[in-house]
């Protein structure tokens, strides 16, 4: 009985460890917030949002 309980506990521990590794290595998809390029799947964090490419947003200033 003790061997069976230890085996089940060991298997559950391995499953929990694999789930933890999978969650910590997840990257952020395009359109979601980020804090650095390494958070994004495509490695472009632009204005705290994951983007496929980083372009300048807004209009140019015009001088009169």
Swiss-Prot record:
Signal sequence segment: 1-26
Homology family: Belongs to the conotoxin I2 superfamily.
Name of protein: Conotoxin Im11.4
Residues that bear Histidine amide: 57
Domain notes from UniProt: The cysteine framework is XI (C-C-CC-CC-C-C).
Gene Ontology MF term list: toxin activity
Keywords, comma-separated and alphabetical: Amidation, Cleavage on pair of basic residues, Disulfide bond, Secreted, Signal, Toxin
Tissue distribution of the protein: Expressed by the venom duct.
InterPro entries: Conotoxin-I_CS, Conotoxin_I2
Compartments in which it is found: Secreted
GO cellular component: extracellular region
Disulfide bond positions: 27-41, 34-46, 40-50, 45-54
Pfam families reported for this sequence: Conotoxin_I2
Proregion positions: 61-64
Keyword Disulfide bond on entry: yes
Taxonomic superkingdom: Eukaryota
């Amino acid at each position: 009985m003790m061997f069976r309980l230890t085996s089940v506990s060991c298997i559950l521990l391995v499953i929990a460890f694999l789930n933890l590794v999978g969650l910590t290595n997840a990257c952020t998809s395009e359109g979601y917030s980020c804090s650095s390029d390494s958070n994004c799947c495509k490695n472009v964090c632009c204005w705290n949002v994951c983007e496929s490419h980083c372009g300048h947003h807004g209009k140019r200033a015009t001088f009169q």
